[in-house]
UniProtKB/Swiss-Prot annotation:
Belongs to the DXR family. The lineage of its organism: Bacteria, Pseudomonadati, Pseudomonadota, Gammaproteobacteria, Pseudomonadales. One of its GO terms (molecular function) is NADPH binding. Gene3D superfamilies: 1.10.1740.10, NAD(P)-binding Rossmann-like Domain. This is 1-deoxy-D-xylulose 5-phosphate reductoisomerase. Keywords: Isoprene biosynthesis, Manganese, Metal-binding, NADP, Oxidoreductase. It comes from Pseudomonas putida (strain ATCC 47054 / DSM 6125 / CFBP 8728 / NCIMB 11950 / KT2440). One of its GO terms (biological process) is isopentenyl diphosphate biosynthetic process, methylerythritol 4-phosphate pathway involved in terpenoid biosynthetic process. It comes from the Bacteria.
């Protein structure tokens, strides 16, 4: 997508107050000649959104409700900030697709990020994709829209960005056509990699959220602890790189230094390494095909000294198996998996279920819900709702 190089690129950051959003703004602030924040959106952290608006002076801010909008407008006026406040999903879609926008960072967590991310794609934007649900829930629809509208899709997940960097430029011709044998998706194994399986019954939300290598929000931290995060990434990788699930192999790599690898038919294996800091993939995607300083410290190979690899233990991490099965089933199965997982993780964070019950609950919902095609966004949300209802029913049935 062409843009006037004499002015900074205008960036909409969907999910500006989350960890990806804040890292994006950090990179943007390092390059004021290249980038400026056009719109920032937030959900519950309105005070943080106010501070970001005062600092970055976007044209627009988006909040979820009229009440939040009234509050933010008053605070912005008091701070002498002229940022215009929009509200709700309509506001999100407006700033994602606005004619002035050059690139959209899609970093809203969960199903709430789906419509605005799709709006950016349908407007043919350069989309920096950090929202997992766009591909997990509606991969076929989403990738078809990317193709039809000529949007540029750049993955932000450190693993998918690593794969993207290790792929030849023409990988869209098909993996076998460009000599790719398989994709190796790395996983840290999370905080419970070596916890005895029987001890997982008693782990707390606090323990699950204490990731050894990455700083993340609570939901994704639990997903990392259960390895559902890696399962969702496997589904995403299949859509992003047009791969069948059997071509994507998960490798546990505790140091989180190698972010993923691509194995070629000639015996070459290309890997992308770096310190575990989301500013690297963000800077890579913002500047692609160029390179810019991200603020991340150079990798010290001598300090790392060693890199370890092991196969994932699917007895310890049944969520990984469930995600692979959903990827193989296709159609509505990944959307159902995702919805059931969201309800289960929330219940675990509220101490209503134990950690191993996350997988048990998801498996029962997957068994109950038939796999059907999802020809429209309405069908995607209908499958999502049915899975949430079945999940809540499971909680009621088990007295939670």
């Amino acid at each position: 997508m062409g843009c006037d190089v004499s002015r900074p690129q205008r960036i909409t950051v969907l999910g500006a107050t989350g960890s990806i959003g804040l890292s994006t703004l950090d990179v943007i602030a390092r390059h004021p000649d290249r980038y400026q924040a056009f719109a920032l959106t937030g959900y519950s952290r309105i005070d943080e959104l106010l501070a970001l608006c005062v600092r970055h002076r976007p044209a627009f801010a988006v909040v979820p409700s009229t009440e939040a909008a009234v509050r933010l407008r008053a605070s912005l006026a008091a701070a002498g900030c002229t940022t215009e406040v929009l509200e709700g999903e309509a506001g999100l879609c407006q700033v994602a697709s606005a004619a002035e926008v050059d690139a959209v960072m899609a970093a809203i967590v969960g199903a709430a990020g789906l419509r605005p991310t799709l709006a950016a794609v349908e407007a043919g934007k350069k989309v920096l994709l950090a929202n997992k649900e766009a591909l997990v829930m509606s991969g076929a629809l989403f990738m078809e829209a990317v193709r039809q509208k000529g949007a540029v899709l750049l993955p932000i997940d450190s693993e998918h960005n690593a794969i993207f960097q290790c792929m030849p430029g023409d990988y869209a011709r098909g993996l076998s056509a460009v000599g790719v044998r398989r994709i190796l998706l790395t996983a840290s194994g999370g905080p419970f990699r070596e916890t005895p399986v029987e001890a997982l019954l008693d782990v707390t939300p606090e323990q699950a959220c204490a990731h050894p290598n990455w700083s993340m929000g609570r939901k994704i931290s639990v997903d990392s602890a259960s390895m559902m995060n890696k399962g969702l990434e496997l589904i995403e990788a299949c859509w992003l790189f047009d791969a069948v699930p059997s071509k994507v192999e998960v490798v546990v790599h505790p140091q989180s230094v190698i972010h993923s690898l691509v194995d070629y038919v000639d015996g070459s294996v290309l890997a992308q390494l770096g310190n575990p800091d989301m500013r690297t993939p963000i800077a890579n995607a913002l500047a692609w095909p160029e390179r810019i300083d991200s603020g991340v410290a150079p990798l010290d190979l001598f300090a790392i000294a060693r890199l370890d690899f092991q196969a994932p233990d699917e007895q310890r991490f049944p969520c990984l198996r469930l995600a692979r099965q959903a990827a193989e089933a296709g159609n509505s199965a990944p959307a159902v998996l995702n919805a059931a997982n969201e309800v289960a993780v929330q219940a675990f964070l509220e101490r209503r279920i134990r950690f191993p019950e996350i997988a048990g609950m998801i498996e029962q919902v997957l068994d109950q819900e038939p796999v059907v095609p999802l020809p429209s966004l309405d069908a995607v949300f209908a499958a999502d709702q049915r899975a949430r209802e079945l999940s809540r029913e499971w909680l009621r049935r088990h007295g939670r």
